Regions:
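ABC ATPase signature
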Residues: 11, 51-52, 65-66
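Conserved ABC ATPase signature
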Residues: 48-52, 56
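A short, proline-enriched helix->beta-strand linker immediately N-terminal to the Walker B motif
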Residues: 66-71, 100
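Catalytic Walker B motif of ABC-type/P-loop ATPase nucleotide-binding domains
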Residues: 73-77
Length: 151
């Protein structure tokens, strides 16, 4: 379980979302969409962030990024520390987000990345060592052996 999730633990779910507003009314405009993607957050609206499960905290962190209008979302390791059943829900939510904005996903779990991304970049020691589509990646036995054999 990660030590840190990008939420305010003492604030309620509502307050965590409200704090992300850039303009008055941002949350009111996005609230229904957020609850369609993350229905658990509606039920937990008055709960403190610190009382949410790890998966719910991840959902809240992503939901907070949705409050202002963004054309690009950077989502870093959304599956880290989550149970498989929670990961499935998170992946479904991220798929829905791609209709609203471009998503740059950083993910070490190959199964998750392979189901969400249409382009891939493999980074080693801070350098891009491969970029392309899944067929490009799978066409290289050397890349499969080096980077995916343990996936």
């Amino acid at each position: 379980m990660p030590d840190y999730r990008a939420i305010f633990r003492q604030l309620t779910v509502e307050e965590n979302l409200k704090i992300a507003e850039r303009r008055p009314g941002d949350l009111a405009r996005k609230r229904q969409f957020i609850f369609e993607i993350f229905p658990d957050l509606e039920k937990l609206y008055q709960w403190p962030g610190g009382q949410l499960s790890g998966g719910q905290q991840q959902m809240l962190a992503i939901a907070r990024a949705l409050v202002p209008d963004n054309s690009l979302l950077l989502i870093d390791e959304p599956s880290e520390g989550l149970a498989p059943v929670i990961i499935e829900g998170m992946m479904a939510a991220i798929r829905r987000l791609t209709a609203q904005a471009a998503v740059l996903l950083v993910e070490q779990n190959f199964r998750v990345a392979s189901q969400l991304a249409d382009r891939y970049v493999i980074i080693e020691d801070g350098r891009s060592v491969h970029s392309g589509t899944m067929p490009d990646l799978l066409a290289s036995p050397a890349l499969i052996q080096k980077y995916l054999s343990a996936a």
